[in-house]
Curated annotation (Swiss-Prot):
Free-text function comment from the UniProt entry: Involved in targeting and insertion of nascent membrane proteins into the cytoplasmic membrane. Binds directly to 7S RNA and mediates binding of the 54 kDa subunit of the SRP.
InterPro entries: Signal_recog_particle_SRP19 (IPR002778), SRP19-like_sf (IPR036521), SRP19_arc-type (IPR022938)
Pfam families: SRP19
An annotated GO BP: SRP-dependent cotranslational protein targeting to membrane
Entry keyword annotation includes RNA-binding: yes
Localization in the cell: Cytoplasm
Gene Ontology MF term list: 7S RNA binding
Summary of subunit composition and partner proteins: Part of the signal recognition particle protein translocation system, which is composed of SRP and FtsY. Archaeal SRP consists of a 7S RNA molecule of 300 nucleotides and two protein subunits: SRP54 and SRP19.
Name under which the protein is recorded: Signal recognition particle 19 kDa protein
CC annotations in GO: signal recognition particle
Keywords: Cytoplasm, Ribonucleoprotein, RNA-binding, Signal recognition particle
Length: 100
């Protein structure tokens, strides 16, 4: 099982890859919240090890305040980081579709 850090900016469709988005824009979600990421990870049976809501991804220190998303989640997943992030983004999209 791989252990890695997930930053909300890695899933944020408003950001370019230069500022840390990892998933393709077609899968990414707008302004993902830490709670959504944790809920998606738990539903996918990933182990949530630590959640810190006040952390800022160092890549975001030089951009506009409105694009900064705070939070950091440490996960353990049977997949690699890229695949795990894609699954989480898809699950968040599913949650948002259901609630809309």
């Amino acid at each position: 099982m791989g252990r890695f850090v997930v930053w909300p900016s890695e899933l944020d469709s408003r950001l370019s890859r230069k500022y840390g988005r990892i998933v393709p824009r077609s899968i990414a979600v707008e302004s993902p919240r830490v709670e959504e990421i944790v809920r998606a990870a738990e539903e996918l049976k990933f182990k949530v090890i630590r959640v810190e809501e006040d952390k800022l991804n160092p890549r975001l220190s030089g951009i506009d305040e409105e694009l900064r998303t705070f939070g950091m989640i440490v996960l353990e997943s049977p997949y690699g980081k890229s695949k795990s992030l894609k699954l989480i983004a898809q699950k968040i999209r599913e949650f948002r579709r259901r609630s809309a």
